[in-house]
Regions:
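Local sequence-structure signature of Cys/Sec-based thiol-disulfide redox active-site neighborhoods
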Residues: 1-28
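Structural micro-motif
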Residues: 49-58, 68
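Non-catalytic, surface beta->alpha helical segment in thiol-disulfide oxidoreductase systems
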Residues: 59-84
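C-terminal alpha-helical interaction module
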Residues: 1-8, 45-48, 68, 83-85
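Thioredoxin-like thiol-disulfide oxidoreductase module
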Residues: 34-52, 78-83
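Non-catalytic interaction surface on structured domains
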Residues: 25-28, 46, 72
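Residues that form or flank phosphate/diphosphate-binding pockets in enzymes
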Residues: 16, 39, 65
Length: 85
């Protein structure tokens, strides 16, 4: 099973949507709270090539992007392949 990490903020609707998709699929993930100014936020930006919006999603260490990119992967069928790896 793939290792999933999601950098999030409490009030973020896109974060909730991304987490909901993984929960609907029965896939476990690690949530990393990354409020503005936190070390976790800086880590998310570093790992994602400078992106500062939330969520930032990683599957097996590979940067996937945010919620829009996750939903695009789901729609194309590629998410299932990434999760099966």
């Amino acid at each position: 099973m793939a290792k999933i990490e999601i950098y999030t903020q409490d009030w973020c609707g896109y974060c909730a949507r991304a987490k909901s998709l993984f929960e609907q699929k029965g896939v476990a993930y690690t949530e990393i709270e990354a409020p503005h100014g936190s070390p976790a936020r800086a880590e998310a930006a570093r790992r994602s090539g400078g992106r500062t919006t939330m969520p930032q999603i990683f599957i097996d260490g590979r940067h996937i992007g945010g919620c829009d990119e996750l939903l695009a992967l789901e729609g194309s069928g590629q998410l299932a392949m990434l999760l099966a790896a």
